[in-house]
Amino acid sequence: IDNRIVGYDAKTGQKKWTVQRTAPALTLRLAPGMVIHDKDVLIAQPGGKLMSLILATGAPRWEIEVGVARGATELERVTDMGGTPVVIDDDVCAVSYQGRVGCFDLATGSPRWTREISSEAGVAVDQRFVFVPDDKGAVFAYNRDSGTSAWKNDKLAYRRLSTPVSYGRAVAV
């Protein structure tokens, strides 16, 4: 992984831009999740970073740390983004391994709310909740507007859970 993002013209296949960031010494080597929304591309980067680029030019709009490296050794400081960021209304919601889950302002990257959690699976989001499994197999639901805890289910403890999917009144992992 060279930590490079490349934008191509959809009609011609010609390269339009390249953005490269320095990779941390250790990562989980998760594939970076990307989502295009309107005129931006949102990218989950190694090292627990979430970045918004202007799709036409590759120019950075903002970059934030969702996962903050902590610990005495390189191994303890490993943090990475889990899954693909999810855009809903004016929010982008994301989670990191050894970091946080949260929803951030789509235009500025400013946090609306964050909670400490560790997940490599990713999030599902609906109009009311953000759903995320932690790395111990518990599934959490947070209020999308405030980040307050709605519920927790730990019946799937110590299983490697997938990115949640929500539909109507159900959520599956």
Task: Set out the residue ranges of the language-model regions.
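Short loop/turn segments that connect beta-strands within beta-propeller blades
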Residues: D9-G13, I54-G58, D105-T108, N143-S146
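Extracytoplasmic beta-rich repeat domains
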Residues: K15-D38, E63-D89, R112-Q127, S149-G168
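WD40 beta-propeller blade core
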Residues: V6, M51, G102, F140-A141
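Structural signature of WD-repeat beta-propellers
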Residues: I1, Q45-P46, D89, S96-Y97, ...
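A generic tandem-repeat structural signature
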Residues: I1-Q20
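Short, intrinsically disordered, charge-balanced linker/junction segments flanking boundaries
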Residues: I1, P164-V173
